[in-house]
């Protein structure tokens, strides 16, 4: 049962060209007859051992636009700069949040102190009205 799910084996380019229909691999003359001396490989495929490819030129013109033009060191530096800016912005955001929290905590502590003072003064007033003196 596992053989059913096994992917097909990879084929070489020559095997793939041999699998193409005969009409695709033979070129036709202007009269429409097949030319048996033509190569079985279509002409639109680049030759792998062409001298212009060995000189280091790009095989496809699109590759030069996709390929990164910067060297790896510059790419590393730009990536590091991006990471540093991200870290500094996150640090600034955290610092702002901490400042806000400090302000809120300071206000809450002040409110707690005023509430304690108000409770003590109310307790003293109640004691004076009832005639108790527990603070002595």
Swiss-Prot record:
InterPro entries per UniProt: Chordopox_Fusion/A27 (IPR003436)
GO BP annotation list: fusion of virus membrane with host plasma membrane; symbiont entry into host cell; virion attachment to host cell
Gene Ontology cellular component terms for the protein in this record: membrane; viral envelope; virion membrane
Composition bias, Polar residues: 24-38
UniProt keyword Membrane present: yes
UniProt entry tagged with the keyword Glycoprotein: yes
Entry superkingdom: Viruses
Homology family: Belongs to the poxviruses fusion protein family.
Functional summary from the UniProt entry: This protein appears to play an important role in virus penetration at the level of cell fusion. The N-terminal proximal region is essential for fusion ability. Essential in fusing the outermost of the two Golgi-derived membranes enveloping the virus with the plasma membrane, and in its subsequent release extracellularly.
Name of this protein: 14 kDa fusion protein
Species: Vaccinia virus (strain WR 65-16) (VACV)
């Amino acid at each position: 049962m596992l053989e059913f799910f096994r992917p097909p084996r990879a084929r070489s380019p020559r095997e793939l060209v041999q699998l193409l229909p005969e009409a695709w691999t033979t070129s036709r003359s202007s009269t429409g007859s097949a030319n048996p001396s033509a190569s079985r490989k279509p002409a639109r495929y680049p030759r792998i051992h062409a001298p212009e490819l060995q000189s280091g030129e790009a095989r496809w013109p699109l590759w030069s636009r996709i390929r990164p033009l910067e060297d790896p060191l510059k790419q590393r530096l730009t990536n590091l700069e991006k990471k540093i800016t991200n870290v500094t912005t996150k640090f600034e955001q955290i610092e702002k949040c901490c400042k806000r929290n400090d302000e809120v905590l300071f206000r809450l502590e002040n409110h707690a102190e005023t509430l304690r003072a108000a409770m003590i003064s109310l307790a003293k007033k109640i004691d004076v009205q009832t005639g108790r003196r527990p603070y002595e």
